Amino acid sequence: MNIRPLHDRVIVKRLEEERKTASGIVIPDTAAEKPDQGEIIAVGKGKTGEDGKIRALEVKVGDRVLFGKYAGQAVKIKGEEFLVMREEDIMGVIEG
């Protein structure tokens, strides 16, 4: 993918959740909620502070992150759906 986010924005690809319950019931797409986890695909250079210096982002490409249900702007690139969001919209990095 060739896209470079600007400033403190990141590109996130949603992680697909299991579409089947523990008892084996398949959940249709219309009833399934969109996942609130994703993988960072690209990061911007950082946010410019009041002193004029650029503060690098804390997240990096490959990080698995947790974000709010309505975070980011959905975009399609070459048929794939991604989210463009600010670093501050990310609630945490999933480790391990």
Curated annotation (Swiss-Prot):
Keywords: Chaperone, Cytoplasm
SUPFAM superfamilies: GroES-like
NCBIfam families, per database record: PRK00364.1-2 (NF001527), PRK00364.1-5 (NF001529), PRK00364.2-2 (NF001531), PRK00364.2-4 (NF001533), PRK00364.2-5 (NF001534)
Any one Gene Ontology molecular-function term assigned to this protein's record: unfolded protein binding
Gene3D superfamilies assigned to the protein according to its UniProt record, in alphabetical order: GroES chaperonin
Purpose of the protein: Together with the chaperonin GroEL, plays an essential role in assisting protein folding. The GroEL-GroES system forms a nano-cage that allows encapsulation of the non-native substrate proteins and provides a physical environment optimized to promote and accelerate protein folding. GroES binds to the apical surface of the GroEL ring, thereby capping the opening of the GroEL channel.
Record text on subunit structure and interactions: Heptamer of 7 subunits arranged in a ring. Interacts with the chaperonin GroEL.
UniProt-listed InterPro entries: Chaperonin_GroES, Chaperonin_GroES_sf, Chaprnonin_Cpn10_CS, GroES-like_sf
Pfam families: Cpn10
Gene responsible for this protein: groES
Organism: Nitrosomonas europaea (strain ATCC 19718 / CIP 103999 / KCTC 2705 / NBRC 14298)
Designated name of the protein: Co-chaperonin GroES
Biological processes annotated in GO: chaperone cofactor-dependent protein refolding
Subcellular location: Cytoplasm
Disulfide bonds: none
Entry GO CC: cytoplasm
Source taxonomy: Bacteria, Pseudomonadati, Pseudomonadota, Betaproteobacteria, Nitrosomonadales
Family, similarity comment: Belongs to the GroES chaperonin family.
